[in-house]
A protein has these predicted regions:
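Short, electropositive alpha-helical surface patch
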Residues: 61-62, 67-69, 234-239, 328-344, ...
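Flexible glycine/acidic-rich beta-alpha junction loops that bind and position SAM and/or redox cofactors
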Residues: 10-16, 106-109, 179, 227-229, ...
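Acidic, low-complexity intrinsically disordered segments
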Residues: 1-214
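Structural recognition of alpha->loop->beta junctions
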Residues: 109-127, 268-276, 336-349
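Radical SAM [4Fe-4S] cluster-binding motif and immediate context
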Residues: 154-317, 322-337, 365
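Radical SAM enzyme core and accessory elements
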Residues: 2-5, 12, 25-26, 48-52, ...
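Short, hinge-like loop/turn segments at secondary-structure boundaries
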Residues: 22, 71, 113-117, 135-136, ...
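A structural motif corresponding to the C-terminal end of an alpha-helix
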Residues: 39-50, 212, 272, 305-316, ...
Length: 521
């Protein structure tokens, strides 16, 4: 049996880091698709199955590939491409299997583009499907009715990829989130019960990724810190292992702001070389948190916990959402001021959406505020009719704020503030050896910011480096890496806002002024 597994090309988006990757030139895309590589590892040893793996972000699809089955996975952002790929292969009489996040959340739509549909986790259903296929009894739909024991999930088979193509390696230590936020569809995919792999399993996967060439590992858990005792033990194990390496591995992950209230956890994260943590703050308005069933976060003051994370040299990447019922036109200025006061360099600004089958979706539908035929992208528009903001205020306010945050003068102020906040430098590692690639990367970054950027960005670059040297020379390397990351967000915010969002005045579009950001229209 020959199976062609395809990870569809991801459209250009805020998270893709295309601008930064293009400068360095070593990596072709941000991270590998863990799901498909896990499917390969799930194959029963007594079956004769040959896999061909294609990451379309790395290499083109071979449309005339001789195979018995095509397997496609994908997120919501990839669904349009998933449908196109499936149609092309079905025209060639190749049966197609589809699974993943989108298929689980929107099975009705996914079923239309495939011959075999996988809903939910596939650790148990994929091996069963392979056996059914061999026996000639494969079903149309395979649905995992209960959440699996994640300890049964094997390490992804990394032998099908090349480390040089990826900036990060993505691994998963746990699934499930005990929270039940009204707008979040995670609990439908992974459940509310927290399930973790064993520490031995996780460390084997980390060591395996490192052996394949991983320099940075992203733990894709929706909430990395749920079981405090488990997290402490895992971080201690990572530290012990990392200290044995000539070139220690760096990490990043996702969590809630509650970690900032736990200084022991924050210090361990810093000692384990966690460089960036995405924090789903969403809003600083307590009423907004209550309205979407996220009241458990009200007790944590973001003005205190976020600077505490920064003090340990960890970059807090703040996830903000606009468009809650309690949001007024003042929300954009409030977010800007908050990011300034907490010296948070990086932030995403999304518009509140109601994914299918979430409590928010049902509430908006019941209240007559749901746009049923919504065809937009989650990070650009919304399927909700806002309450205290006009669609114009919400739509353009988000775009203008997003663009403003990454203007040189505003980013420079926040980044220098962050650098000044850093007080802790782990002294448990020997001086990191300088590899040739890192030297070449730094040269490329300096070349880019010296010769290929607008004058205000170039001035910001040198201002930040001079200030960094004054604050603490040990932060120079971090500053250069952050500036590389910054370029992607600056470049993307200009392209996305001006060209795609009608902020450039082309085609007769009205260009809104920044009074929206001051709560005035």
């Amino acid at each position: 049996m020959k199976i062609y597994l395809i990870n569809p090309k991801t459209p250009e988006n805020f998270w893709a880091m295309r601008g930064a990757l293009d400068i360095v030139g070593k990596h072709k895309t941000l991270m590998q698709n863990t799901a498909l590589l896990t499917l390969i590892a799930l194959t029963p040893g007594d079956l004769d199955v040959e896999y061909i793996y294609c990451d379309e972000n790395i290499a083109p699809i071979h449309w005339d590939m001789g195979c018995d089955l095509v397997g496609i996975t994908g997120y919501t952002l990839q669904f349009e491409r998933m449908g196109f790929i499936s149609a092309r292969f079905r025209e060639r009489c190749r049966p197609v299997a589809v699974g993943g996040i989108y298929a689980t959340i929107n099975p009705e739509n996914a079923k239309k583009i495939c011959d075999h549909l996988f809903i939910g986790e596939a650790e148990y259903t994929w091996p069963q499907f392979l056996r059914d296929w061999v026996n000639g009894s494969a079903k149309v739909v395979y649905k995992q009715e209960t959440f699996i024991d994640i300890k049964d999930s094997p390490a992804p088979d990394l032998s099908y990829i090349k480390a040089k193509n990826y900036h990060y390696f993505s691994l998963q230590t746990s699934r499930g989130c005990p929270n039940n936020c009204d707008f979040c569809d995670v609990v439908r995919v992974t459940g509310r019960k927290y399930r973790s792999k064993s520490i031995n399993q996780i460390m084997l996967e980390v060591k395996n990724a490192h052996a394949f060439g991983a320099e940075t590992i992203f733990f894709s858990d929706d909430n990395f810190v749920v079981n405090r005792k488990f997290t402490i033990e895992l971080l201690q194990e990572i530290i012990r292992w990392n200290r044995t390496l000539d070139m220690p591995v760096s990490f990043s992950t996702q969590a809630t702001v509650m970690i900032g209230a736990d200084e022991e956890i924050v210090k361990l994260l810093a000692d384990a070389r966690f460089r960036v943590i995405f924090l789903g703050l969403e809003t600083i308005n307590k009423d907004c948190l209550e309205e979407v069933n996220k009241g458990q976060m009200v007790q944590y003051d973001p003005f205190q916990v976020i600077p505490r994370i920064s003090r340990y040299g960890i970059i807090p990447f703040i996830g903000m959402i606009v468009g809650f019922d309690h949001d007024t036109p003042a929300v954009f200025k409030e977010i800007e001021d908050f990011l300034d006061k907490t010296a948070s360099p990086f932030a995403s600004i999304s518009v509140l959406n109601a994914p299918n089958h979430t409590p928010l979706y049902e509430r908006m539908k019941r209240d007559g505020r749901l746009i049923e035929d919504f065809r937009g992208f989650w990070h650009l528009t919304t399927n909700i009719i806002p309450k205290q903001l006009t669609p114009h205020e919400l739509y353009f306010g988000q775009k203008l704020l997003f663009k403003k945050l990454y203007e040189p003068e505003h980013f420079e102020r926040r980044m220098i503030g962050w650098l000044k906040n850093v007080k802790y430098f782990p002294d448990i590692y020997s001086t990191r050896k300088k590899d040739l690639f890192r030297i070449v990367m730094i040269i490329k970054i300096f070349y880019h910011f010296t010769l290929r950027v607008p004058a205000p960005v170039r001035m910001m670059f040198w201002n930040i480096l001079k200030e960094t040297w004054k604050i603490d020379p040990r932060l120079i390397s971090r500053a250069v890496s952050m500036l590389l990351q910054y370029w992607h967000y600056y470049d993307f915010s200009h392209k996305e806002s001006d060209e795609k969002m009608g902020l450039d005045g082309k085609d007769g579009a009205q260009v809104p002024d920044e009074s929206i950001l001051m709560g005035k229209t």
